Amino acid sequence: MIIGIGSDLIDITRVGKVIERHGERFLDRIFTAAERAKAERRAKNEKMVVATYAKRFAAKEACSKALGTGIRRGVWWRDMGVVNLPGGRPTMQLTGGALARLQALTPDGFEARIDVSITDDWPLAQAFVIISAVPLAKS
């Protein structure tokens, strides 16, 4: 059963301007170490670095909407991180207030699954997040 849906669309150049203006302070405040490492692996192409950050920013916004809180009520930027599953499919790794909110939304006898779709087509980045409750496997 679906327990939350969120989407976000962002101008990649806007993210680039914020990074230029605030640099490390912005990056440290918003992105996890894993997200920063992924973006910086693309360092040979500045547009790809900024697009990588923009897609992750959009995914965090979409996830916060799917959680029903936005970036408030104890859910903060670094509580949500885009990670890739072994097959490469993106998902969200939640901690802190975001994880607490997810646990509160997930009914007993179910586990949460977070599906993420991220894309970019310069100058836009977009993300969709669907949070589902999946019945626990019977032992």
UniProtKB/Swiss-Prot annotation:
<dbReference type="InterPro" id="IPR002582">
    <property type="entry name" value="ACPS"/>
</dbReference>
<dbReference type="Pfam" id="PF01648">
    <property type="entry name" value="ACPS"/>
</dbReference>
<keyword id="KW-0963">Cytoplasm</keyword>
<dbReference type="GO" id="GO:0005737">
    <property type="term" value="C:cytoplasm"/>
</dbReference>
<keyword id="KW-0275">Fatty acid biosynthesis</keyword>
<protein>
    <recommendedName>
        <fullName>Holo-[acyl-carrier-protein] synthase</fullName>
        <ecNumber>2.7.8.7</ecNumber>
    </recommendedName>
</protein>
<dbReference type="GO" id="GO:0008897">
    <property type="term" value="F:holo-[acyl-carrier-protein] synthase activity"/>
</dbReference>
<keyword id="KW-0479">Metal-binding</keyword>
<keyword id="KW-0276">Fatty acid metabolism</keyword>
<dbReference type="GO" id="GO:0006633">
    <property type="term" value="P:fatty acid biosynthetic process"/>
</dbReference>
<comment type="function">
    <text>Transfers the 4'-phosphopantetheine moiety from coenzyme A to a Ser of acyl-carrier-protein.</text>
</comment>
<comment type="similarity">
    <text>Belongs to the P-Pant transferase superfamily. AcpS family.</text>
</comment>
<dbReference type="InterPro" id="IPR037143">
    <property type="entry name" value="4-PPantetheinyl_Trfase_dom_sf"/>
</dbReference>
<feature type="binding site">
    <location>
        <position position="8"/>
    </location>
    <ligand>
        <name>Mg(2+)</name>
    </ligand>
</feature>
<dbReference type="InterPro" id="IPR004568">
    <property type="entry name" value="Ppantetheine-prot_Trfase_dom"/>
</dbReference>
<dbReference type="GO" id="GO:0000287">
    <property type="term" value="F:magnesium ion binding"/>
</dbReference>
<feature type="binding site">
    <location>
        <position position="61"/>
    </location>
    <ligand>
        <name>Mg(2+)</name>
    </ligand>
</feature>
<keyword id="KW-0444">Lipid biosynthesis</keyword>
<dbReference type="InterPro" id="IPR008278">
    <property type="entry name" value="4-PPantetheinyl_Trfase_dom"/>
</dbReference>
<keyword id="KW-0443">Lipid metabolism</keyword>
<keyword id="KW-0460">Magnesium</keyword>
<keyword id="KW-0808">Transferase</keyword>
